[in-house]
Amino acid sequence: MNKVISKKEAIAHVHDGSVLMVGGFNTSGDPNELVEALRTKTSVKNITLISTDSGVTDSPLTNMLSEGRFKKVIGTFFGANKEIQKRVNEGTIEYELVPQGTFVERIRSAGAGLGGVITPTGVGTVVAEGKQKINIDGREYLIEKPLRGEVAFIRAEIADESGNLVMIGNAKNTNTVMAMAADFVIAQANQIVKTGEIDPDDVTVPSIYVDAIVLAGEEI
């Protein structure tokens, strides 16, 4: 099955009120072309964004933030994003700040169909507010619920037409786990090859998790 689609077809899967996962961290592995297409070619809004850092200065995600397109942001690090800091301080956006390890495990648990993550991280801090707790062998843990998206934008170096992906180095980051934790997964790839041209040992994300592929650099 050939899963290659246009950017126009890809962004049509995001609607007003969607829960959108975006892979990458601090410019590494960011599917910026998909986000920019969503920003410039649609008017969707009230999106809940699940992203490690919600973009850096002048990134497509930050530009969407400044346009007020996100209703809520769930992430781990907002220190490099002045726009989200501004909106949080103004009270014009909902946000959930999650410890980075917990963030990844919550996504992984969604992909595995689990009911959540049990972790000591955040006990006794603001992170624990409003969350269910459990005591195991005299130690207190938080029960963190899974994080799942309706649509995920991820990025790969190489994809084959069936959706097998190759990711390189630290660009793997959250892209790998988000591929397993969304209802519809779209990969932006720098190169697309015929099915069978990627050595199975080189596959980072198998095609079973990928619903669509777009080629980076193509016009919308």
Q: Model regions: which residues?
A:
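Conserved alpha/beta enzyme-core scaffold
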Residues: 1-220
